[in-house]
């Protein structure tokens, strides 16, 4: 972003990634084992199997985390291991974010570096991730600014860096089904529409429904007869003269539990795998739409071929390119 020109049409992007002793990328004489420059819009990683495409996505996930709040931690397999030797005890990932708008820069102002150019002041954010082993434990840290003397990044700024991640899809129907910790509930819980977890309109709807259910068992209905029978049975084998005040109550309501009861279904009966995969992707991309907080708009898509057949891939790529043109989303 060149503030001197007042450019606000661009959005911040991941412009460079450097990895040191991460997975198969060995650092030599302090130089990164892999260095990639990214650009705006769609960035395609092309290579043979085991060439490191997944490592690039995983490196970005370790640094940025994801909007659906997946559990992301370094593991033993992340440390470079020479053939026949012990694995390294440390790996590092450096990431440069550039092209800030003023709305975005205000959220990171204490962390930004700047460079005076002929077109104005260019701001960048330098992220330095490090993981290391001590015995059997693995520790990690993320710092910003100077590589040797950086500072920790605070909670809000950290949240604004999270990426949208489409993982390799194996079973779209299961991913979109209801259940504890379901994918669709994770997506909805992290959407701005559900930011208020305690006083949401959905909670009011369920409170009203629960009140009507409880009233069913105390009004002039079959439900009242059921409750009276339970009380009568209890009184008959309780201490003599002890009245029963048993009640039928609904459970406490939490937004998370409500959203976990939802499933996302295709309108067709017995839809094909491609239709389900597109439905899954459409739901995942929900988290890219909001731009009110001035956060990073980045989608990480792994193994597109695992999601769709070739024609559907082309349609999705065309959509993603249009999405960038309209909303300045970066896709890797």
Question: Language-model features: where?
Answer:
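Electropositive, glycine-dotted interaction segments
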Residues: 92-94, 98-207, 211
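Non-catalytic alpha-helical coupling and interface elements of nucleotide-dependent molecular machines
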Residues: 51, 61-69, 100-102, 134, ...
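Residues at beta-strand starts and edge strands
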Residues: 12-13, 32, 87-93, 121-125, ...
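Extended helical coiled-coil dimerization/tether regions that scaffold
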Residues: 1-11, 175-179, 185-301, 322
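Short alpha-helical segments and helix-capping/turn motifs at coil-helix boundaries
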Residues: 76-81, 145-153, 249
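Conserved P-loop NTP-binding catalytic core
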Residues: 1, 57-119
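Switch/communication elements of ASCE P-loop NTPase nucleotide-binding domains
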Residues: 1-65, 259, 263-332
